[in-house]
Amino acid sequence: MDAITINSLFLIGAVLVGASILLSSLSSRLGIPILVIFLAIGMLAGTDGIGGIAFDNYPVAYLVSNLALAVILLDGGMRTRASSFRVALWPALSLATVGVLITAGLTGLAAAWLFDLDIIQGLLIGAIIGSTDAAAVFSLLGGKGLNERVSATLEIESGSNDPMAVFLTITLISMISAGESSLSWMFLVHLIQQFGLGIIIGLGGGSLLLLLINRIELPSGLYPLLAVSGGILVFSLTTAMNGSGILAVYLCGLMLGNRPIRNRAGILQTFDGLAWLSQIGMFLVLGLLLNPSELLPIAIPALILSLWMILFARPLSVFIGLLPFPSFNLRERIFISWVGLRGAVPVILAVFPMMAGIPHANLFFNVAFFVVLVSLLLQGTSLSFAARKTKLVVPPALAPVARIGLDIDKNNQWEQFIYQLSSDKWCIGAALRDLKMPQETRIAALFRGKDLLHPNGNTRLKEGDILCVIGQEHHLPALGKLFSQSPSIQLDERFFGDFILDADAKLDDISQIYGLNLEQGVDKQQTLGQFVLYLFGGEPVIGDQIEWDGLTWTIAEMESDRVSRVGVKIVTDKA
């Protein structure tokens, strides 16, 4: 490869990445997932597109895609709160195992019939497209304002269901290569190995990496690089030992994100850029790999297979997988059934048969790609609509305009929160001395227009003022009520109810004020929060609703795992 060729590759790569970034704004305008934009640019640059770039190097595509997935999952793990596991761990694991098996089996049987393949070959197609994709889920769920039970279940499922899909794919390829038609007992051993090594190395490697980051003194710009290189090491080491590298790197990120860590803000900021670059690079390469003209001959059976999986196999697997978990209501089950997003992982798995050289490998690849396109276009574009129709969107937490990490003490993560005051905030016109600021928070600066003011207790706030407040993450709810702008998501203003009650209020007092008909045997001295937990059962989340005694009770706020405020809405006139 000479210097001119290398320079040409740099030029082409820069143009494609730059075009992807500039055209990403079309995603919100056209209402299509941003990943489809990246994929389309890759396809346009490919053999059948205007670019005419001939790219069929499957090993390189496999390398780029796995590296990108490792970075995306490391970032996703860091941003996943450990508290999410309280409500979603076991349901997500059920979907990641039982759900994938059912989806792969039903889809595989349909594929064998539609494409005139034998059962093992059909099941291989089912295994390839049987798991949801973490990159697609993390990208498309972000900012949708879903309740925690649903969003956490989908995210944890997408980060943990790849071991089953990878294992099924490799096992079925081995069976086809060896001419076998039945499974041996080693099937279970290999499955345990995939999950076991992924969990052990992921948690262990994450702990060691966390210890190293907190112990070693480095320039601040090197901590994010140490974190990402450590995550890739965990991914590659686990994969080399025949474990699930995808699960391992996700758990590694989870460890880093939920423990005190040096330069957290810098690491997260760098990871955000790396995750975007990884998504762009991965879908550009996959788009280059595809020849759209090869999809036309299989379009009708592949479309039928996609609809079969989306409308039947996935919903059935979700309803069966969530049977042991009564806390999920029907609306939540329907939405989770719909958001079985496919993305890069099925295409990466479809590369395995190509590299193994088994019969019909090109068919498997094209079918997987077609299913991914249908999933992103059909499910991805309708995700917001489905969330609204199933009433799973909750008012977003009031957030500052920007957050800047202050790397002062890894055990006390101080940040600077920036708020711009809108006209609907009650604090407009109030003197600073009258603000009930949370303990241990301080207003560090006040900007009015382009001027930096020197505020004192008599300074009165005006619309458009920009406040810089020093505090910690747990101060955000209280600060949000004081300073945040109104959320942009359109919701019923009375989502939580006609009025909101303190969950520490005694049930007896509330029943007398509102005329509640308490059942015999109910402890009237318990708090409203305790009574609501009794009504809901399981692990509640913000936005959970239940009708009781002619009223709709909605969990409005939670502190850790404790209900702190409850909304009440009148449903019917009580006699």
UniProtKB/Swiss-Prot annotation:
Localization in the cell: Cell inner membrane
Output the InterPro entries linked to this UniProt entry.
Answer: Cation/H_exchanger_TM, FAD-bd_PCMH-like_sf, FAD-bd_PCMH_sub2, Na+/solute_symporter_sf, NhaP2, RCK_C, RCK_C_sf, Transptr-assoc_dom
Name the catalysed reactions: K(+)(in) + H(+)(out) = K(+)(out) + H(+)(in)
Task: Mark the transmembrane ranges.
Answer: 3-23, 30-50, 58-78, 95-115, 122-142, 172-192, 194-214, 221-241, 270-290, 293-313, 334-354, 358-378
Pfam families for the chain: CorC_HlyC, Na_H_Exchanger, TrkA_C
Q: Looking at the keywords, is Transmembrane helix present?
A: yes
Question: Which GO molecular function, any one, fits this protein according to its record?
Answer: potassium:proton antiporter activity
Q: Specify the signal sequence span.
A: none
What is the superkingdom listed in this entry's lineage? Bacteria
Q: Which UniProt keywords apply?
A: Antiport, Cell inner membrane, Cell membrane, Ion transport, Membrane, Potassium, Potassium transport, Transmembrane, Transmembrane helix, Transport
Residues folding into a coiled coil are: none
Q: Name one GO biological process term.
A: cell volume homeostasis
Q: Which SMART domains match?
A: CorC_HlyC (SM01091)
Q: What membrane topology is given?
A: Multi-pass membrane protein
Q: Which GO terms describe its cellular component?
A: plasma membrane
Where does the RCK C-terminal domain start and stop, copy by copy? 403-485
The family classification in the record reads: Belongs to the monovalent cation:proton antiporter 1 (CPA1) transporter (TC 2.A.36) family. NhaP2 subfamily.
What role is this protein assigned? K(+)/H(+) antiporter that extrudes potassium in exchange for external protons and maintains the internal concentration of potassium under toxic levels.
The protein depicted here goes by the name K(+)/H(+) antiporter NhaP2
